[in-house]
Amino acid sequence: MAVARQGRAGVMRAAGLAAALIAAMTTFGLAAQPLPALQEFYFDTDPAAVPMVVVPAGSGDLVDQLMKQRERGRKALDATVQLAGVAFSQGRPELGRTLYAEASSSTQPTTAAGRAVRWNYGWDLFRLGEVEAALAQWSTAQGGMRGNPSWVPATYALALWTLGRKDEAVQWYAAAVRTEPQQWGSSARYADLLPSWRDSERATLAEVQKAWAAQPPAWP
């Protein structure tokens, strides 16, 4: 327990500097990063596009368990990412950014682990309201994989609609429908297709679906 407390203290001491560095990176380029070119189809499964969970979220000693996992090494990366998510959810974004900076610096975006870090970071940023920064992380995760990951169209559509870039959102949603029309042609299966999304996020995507259905864009 004492070791875990010391580890948390060390992470917290580093939070200020890392947060400042990441904020500067976001201000001077990440937010303006363009999205990859829209493709016709997105059939490729990306095993990295899943929440990184080591300890069940309802555990009473969640933070202590995650700190122990970080120290043991075998699941240190997953534990670091989950701990970052806990920090964001508890209103401690500076600590969350520090932990994600640590996880990002230890992985390459061309690896499954690196893509997973950036995919998860994107979701935590999105839920913090930093949608442009979330898109930058997701774009990096997408670029690290050969092929066209199936998670991309709906995720980008959600983010772009949230930013008010509704025409672009519909274009990305159309790619999801072209790829799997039985899945994305309506919003009826969202709970099954998007189990890790919040109800509010699925509701936003349903707005995109309605806009797509009202005027489906042609390809190309």
For each predicted feature, which ranges?
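N-terminal leader/linker segments that initiate helical-solenoid repeat arrays
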Residues: 29-82
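Alpha-helical adaptor scaffolds
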Residues: 85-150
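Boundary/linker segments of alpha-helical solenoid repeat arrays
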Residues: 109-114, 145-153, 178-192
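Alpha-helical repeat scaffolds
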Residues: 61-66, 97-103, 131-143, 167-179, ...
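Flexible helix-coil transition and linker loops at the boundaries of alpha-helical arrays
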Residues: 65-73, 105-112, 144, 183
